[in-house]
Structure formats: C-alpha cells, structure tokens
Amino acid sequence: MKRREFIATGTAAAAGLLLLKPRAAFGYQANSAVRLGLLGCGSRGTSVATSFAKNTSAQIVALADLFPDRLAVAREHFSQVNASGGAQPIAEKLLFHGPRAFEQLAASQDVDLIQISTPPFFHVQHLEAAVAAGKHVYCEKPVGIDVDQARQALEIGKRVKPTQSVDVGFQCRNAAPIAAIAEKIKGGALGKIGTVFGSYNASAAEENTHPASGADEHRLRNWVWDRALSGDILVEQNIHIIDLCNWLLGAHPLKAIATGGRNILTHAGDCWDHYEVDFTYPGDVRFAFASTQFGEYEMFEAGLKLFGSTGAATVPYVGPVQIRGKQAWAWQESLGTDPNSGKFAANGAFTYNLASADPDKERTFIDSITSGPAHNQLAAGVETALTCMLGRMAGYQGREVTWEDLLAHGETYKLGMTLDQFA
C-alpha cells in the first residue's frame, strides 16, 4: 500500500458516503425498527447500545459476549431498556456466548445491525464476519491494532455492499460545537495553520477482578491495559483527538517522533501510561500531542488548540469552543453546568461539548440505514488508526518514523492464547 494509493482510497471513503437513491434501495418502511445485535457487552458497548435504543428507531434484539456472566448482566439491563421503550424482551435464541458467539450473531436472520464493542484486537475478525453476512455495522474504534489488521480492514471496506452502512465510532465529529468550528476552520478562518497542540489526560480505569479467573481471562477482562488486545492507549483511547486533527487538517502525518513509558501504573498489563508525540503533516504543520492515563483523582482534559496566521482555535471536550483573531467566533449554545463534566467517563458518556455526540452520530447512522445514502467509514477509520500506530512505533523504537516506514515495517501482534478454552 503506497502512500499515494492510501491517500486516494482514504479520501474517497473518508466522507463515509455512497450516493444512492434513498428509501427504495434500503428496504425499510418509515419509522420501522432496525434490529440491533450487540457484540461485546462491556461498559462501553452497553452504553452505546442503550443510547441507540433511546435515541433512534433501533431495537436491541440480540446479545453476544465471550463470557456468560457479562451476557446475563446485559440481558437484565436491556430487558429494562426494552420494556421502558415498549419493545419485546430479548429472545433466548438470540443470546450467544463463547468464542463462536460472533459467528452465531452474524448468521442470525433476526439481526440487521451489529454493534462491535469487543476488545480492538478482534475488530477486524468481527468486521469480516458481519460484513460478509450482509449486516450493517457500527464498529468501535480502532478498526485494527496493527498494520496487518489495518490492511485487512481496508480490504473489508472494499467489499461493503452499496446498501450496507458501516460506521466507525468517531462520534466527536458529530458533536454540534465541534462540527460547527470544524466548518469554520476548514473554510480558512485561521489562515495558514502552522501548529496544533493536543492532549488526552485521564485517570486510569480500575483493574477488573473476577473470581477464579486465570491469567488469560484476566487479560481479556482487563483488555484496555493489554497492548495486543487494545493497541495501547495511543491507538485505543487517544485516537479520538488524533482523528480530530486529521479531520481538521484534511491529511495524515508524514512522520512522527515520540517518547513515553509506564511510570505510574502498577496493575497487570503492558500498555504505556503516557505519550508525547510530535507529528509532522504536509506543509510542515506540526502537531504536538501528549497523553496520560493514570491516577485516581478523576481528572479529565482533552482537546485541540490550532494556531494559524490569522486566528487561533480551541476545540476542547469541556470548555469554550471558539476562534480568536480576524474571524473571531464562539459556540454560543449553553450546555449547562455539570459538576462531573471534568471527570473521565470510562463508558464514553461525556457531558458538555460531547453531550450530543453519541445520539447525533447514532441518529445519522440509523438514517443512513433506513433512508440512505449508505455510509462506509472504514477507510477513514484505517487512516486514523495508522496515524496512531505511527506515533506508537516512534515511541517504542525511540526514533523518527515515516509513514512509508510504518507501512513497510510496522509492528504486528499475536493474541498468545486460544479462545476455545472459554467454550
């Protein structure tokens, strides 16, 4: 995959749209329910699926997870969600657990849409099964954790049917304040952009313990701190801010140099707890990014600052979204005061500037299924994932890494266990 070929492919699909005649091509009656199957019943998966049920015409009809205890908790939760919305409880035949649960879910004729919220290592495998089965897919980020998986995801994207919608969980783009300032920035409100600063600072997720679990099960239940399962914090969590930078600049970086390590965290896992990355974009635009994920003080701060020849912009998760300079502008809608707005939400349910991000993205996605045009966001998801891998590789190897070097020599990861033991 040469750089120019990648850019051409990514640019064509980054908008996530295939222009088709609506309604007739999509086969859904107005206001009919889209039947959603949740694959991965953890905190984030449950939160997003609940939001789908509450904010769209989607109904949760099926659940799948590796572990039966997770499945049981999710079933109880969604029984209440469905009852509150006047929907039917989930049928016994649509509850799947074990290492083949994803295949059983994909094969079900009772499911239209699969939400993939499993550990990132499995995203490509689960994408492959869902897309091949003709399902619509909402896949959490990242679409892959290494270069080989990124290539696989790009190929899967080419096999998505014209009436099939596939979204990647970059909901920040759908937050109203961020979408509004993005339009200004892309329209030249900052002049020539010279430098960008970004951050993602959060406290650490608690270690998940489970009775009688062995080493492999402990890894899976704490996948967020496992390098092979998550891709490390830069690829799994910090990806939101890096995606915003790629989106606002309309490009991916050409090279990166980075440092980082694991200085504070003591629980199981091999992910780093901090990164400092200097990305260089076309036109010698620099993006300095820093992240931390440790501590128990519930601090959370994330966002971008962009500096141009005629203006500067702040694009935070929490705080004023504004431009200063010749084309001064500020997001005016009041988002209220919430004492929890500066706290990290492990399930991604943030307040303030991202308050409407999940519901708005979900509504747009469901509309693409019922009315069209269909989405195909896999190429854009691949480009952002590779950008994060570029920074990760530069940090691990302690040297400058180019985009071409990443594609030729990027790390690959193996799971190091068999899931058949959980059958």
Task: Name each region found by the language model.
Residues E5-A25:
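N-terminal export signals
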Residues T9-A13, S47, H240-W247, P253, ...:
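C-terminal helical cap and adjacent loop that interface with cofactors, partners, or active-site loops
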Residues L19-T56:
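C-terminal segment of N-terminal export signals and the immediately downstream linker at the start
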Residues G40, K161-D167, C172-G269, F279, ...:
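Predominantly a Rossmann-like dinucleotide-binding segment in NAD(P)-dependent oxidoreductases
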Residues S57-N82:
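NAD(P)-binding Rossmann-fold cofactor-contacting core
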Residues N82-I116:
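A structured beta-alpha segment of the ubiquitous adenosine-cofactor-binding alpha/beta core
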Residues V124-R173, G188:
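Beta-strand-loop-alpha-helix segment that lines the small-molecule cofactor/substrate pocket
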